[in-house]
Amino acid sequence: MPPESNSQAIIVLGMHRSGTSAFTGLLNLLGVDLGPKLMAASPDNQTGYWEHTEIVALHDRLLAALGSRWDDVSRLPEEWWLRPEVAPYREQIKAILSRDFGSSPLWALKDPRMCRLMPLWKMLIPEMGLSPVWVLVARHPYENIGSLDKRDQFSWQKSELLWLRHNLEAEYFSRDARRVVVTFDQFLADWAGAMERLRAAIGLPWPVPPEIAAEQAARYVDPGMRHHKAADISRLSAWSREVHAALLAGAEGHETDMQTGMDAVRHAADIADSLYEPMLRDRGGELEQQLAAESARFGEISDCLQEMRVKYAEAKEKLAARKAELDENKARLKAFERTPGAKLNRLLGAGA
């Protein structure tokens, strides 16, 4: 059944490696329902990802259907969420939410891919009678890029573009909705204060009161979660510095200042996208054709190699058969040489 009308959802947004996992893990300690099956922890994220496995897999399939993937820095197609082929994904998401959160008074979802896919979510959530609170978790771009470099070995430029793309889109598409902006610094320094801001936006008490969860939360929110610290920010582009400043303003409650700062960068980025994306896509198409040609050539070589293996196996089998035949003949000859007739022939030959 659909989530009850008084069901409250929290949607956690943020770039990959921005602290969204730590934030969502704390929601779990406060009793927020995260669903029945979550992505397992890994050496890169030992405290857990806290992501709904089915939702993440569905997001990946949707991005692939749109010709994209989670680490694609390009814009998605115009009004992609209105395409007929996207409708089945919307219905699948609604079915998952109804099944897993139908009776949950307070639940949350977190997947960085939602930053890119928010238009679809903003369409389907009202269809289910829900009014979520969106939480944008922001981390200093220098730290975020360093974390991506360690995990994925992305170039600085790609990581910075991903950081910009995710934050610009998450901020833009969460406008005109209940939202809270929290920086990773705020979360580490005062998790209780960050959660109180979110609780006030929700208008509901936490299922597990913070004073009860405090001891466990204090152990969970460890400053050691920060493996990368902002250092030489001169490496950052002006756009990243401006977006970071805007997010800091939003985290302090200055909504207008945040939107103004984000709009300035978004406008410039849109102009750059319109200039460079066609060229990059053409180049990408050329590379795909080259890859297809090389793949075909590799296939031909593989087929040839397989044919040679078959011929080699056949030759080896024939050689083994000939050797066996030769061994058999040698054995027969030795056996014959031991017979009386063979000995007599040798004696007669010697007498002659």
Each language-model region and where it sits:
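A structural motif corresponding to the C-terminal end of an alpha-helix
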Residues: 96-105, 169-180
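Short, well-ordered alpha-helical microsegments
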Residues: 20, 115-119, 191
